[in-house]
Amino acid sequence: NSLIVFTKNRDKKITELYLVPKQPGNYNAKKIGALNVESIVTGADYNEKLQLLVLTSTKKFTKYYLTTIKNFSLDIKQDYEMKMYEIPIGKTQVEAVKIIDNKNFWITSEDEKNSKFARLMKFSL
């Protein structure tokens, strides 16, 4: 019944997580924790049934990564097992990720000067 909002912290390379209700209205976001992802988050998806959180991120805007966090719940813990995989996309701006299942994901990127096309890719582990 809530949306998870992820922040970008370019200096500390962490992401903070906040909850807001899905219903229309004025709310204060409730901070539920932070994750040390060692990168700048550009997209995220959470599948409650799979207990899987997936993030797309970059370290220096030249390489992009997919990070999986298994057994994730909204009761933020500090001992999550995070795995980071390089996305073979080159220099472009990865914008979003959608979980298909535990090993397959849709990833989108912006249209950039050097790539000339926006991209939709299926990424498999």
Regions found by a protein language model. Give the residues of each.
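Sequence/structural signature of beta-propeller domains
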Residues: 1-125
